[in-house]
Amino acid sequence: MEVIWKFALQITDRQTVTMPVGAEILSVQDQAGGLQLWAIVVPEEERREKRVIEIVGTGNPMADVLAEGLSRFHLATVQARGGALVWHVFELL
């Protein structure tokens, strides 16, 4: 049976989030001042995979992921503090 899990994100350039294999990322939003990622998962799936998440603030430089042999998939743009802070959240593939 599928369920939706929430994963807390750090506000940092790059991080790894461990999820059940096959998790489908739905959304990233600000919740109570912190970034949260929601994904559909199968809790009975014992295998885990590491998903690489990149967060870039508006106006900040972006890493050259092509030079690393990676690509970006946009997950969300999140505004916090009434729009004073804007983060663009990607999964690196």
Predicted regions and their residues:
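N-terminal domain-onset segments
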Residues: 1-38, 43, 49-51, 61-71
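Helix-rich interaction surfaces within compact, conserved domain-sized segments
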Residues: 51-93
